[in-house]
Regions:
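A broadly conserved detector of short glycine/acidic/proline-rich loop/turn motifs that flank catalytic sites
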Residues: 31, 64, 162
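A structural preference for short, pocket-lining loop segments at secondary-structure junctions
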Residues: 22-28, 41-86, 93-112, 134-138
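Short beta-strand/loop segment at the start of cytosolic alpha/beta domains
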Residues: 1-31
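Conserved catalytic cores of soluble enzyme domains
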Residues: 88-92, 96, 100-184
């Protein structure tokens, strides 16, 4: 990825935002395995703020073996074992708000996933205006496999997408849409 300048315009231990030129802000993870943690979540909010103020678009891209392996479940487990419920609630709420900020941003947001795009990584893509996925992209809301409900608005975005084809003014029985959306 071509970057303008020698340093990111924003950054912390979990993620960075770079000026890519042509009015585009690039957002990339620095966390272990491109996992989502408090630092990544904080940087999502800062990057959207900066992009809406100083840029015309934002692209989410990553380096490494996978686009994103989802939430750092070891950090989640550690917080749960220490009964840090308020910290967990805040992390989930901030991430949900972050993915929704992408969705409702005043600038277009494009995600460029590749390889493993799991859990929260897929939810980032679902919150984006457009997705340019690599041919070998394997995506899923895999949290269910460890007994968790996806927490970054992914299930809501799946349901909204299933309702997009319903004509305006029609009041459908949404049960059929819900079961079809979540049956797999």
């Amino acid at each position: 990825i071509m970057r303008k300048g020698g340093a990111p315009v924003l950054g912390n231990r979990g993620a960075e935002a770079w000026d890519l030129g042509d009015g585009v802000l690039g957002f990339t993870f620095k966390s272990d395995y491109n996992s989502i943690d408090d630092n990544v979540i904080a940087m999502i909010h800062q990057a959207v703020d900066r992009a809406e103020k100083d840029f015309r678009a934002m692209i989410i891209f990553n380096h490494g073996d996978n686009f994103c392996v989802g939430a750092n479940l070891m950090a989640v487990l550690g917080a749960a074992m220490q009964k840090q419920w308020d910290q967990l609630r805040k992390m989930i709420r901030d991430y949900q708000y972050g993915t929704q900020r992408l969705k409702y941003s005043t600038i277009p947001v494009v995600a460029a996933p590749f390889a493993g795009t799991m859990g929260g990584g897929l939810e980032l893509c679902m919150g984006s205006d457009a997705v340019q996925a690599a041919a070998e992209t394997y995506a899923g809301l895999v949290e269910v496999g460890v007994g968790l409900i996806p927490g970054g608005a992914g299930t809501m975005n799946m349901l909204w997408r299933s309702l997009e084809g319903v004509p305006e003014g029609v009041d459908p029985d949404v049960y059929g849409f819900v079961t079809q959306t979540f049956k797999n």
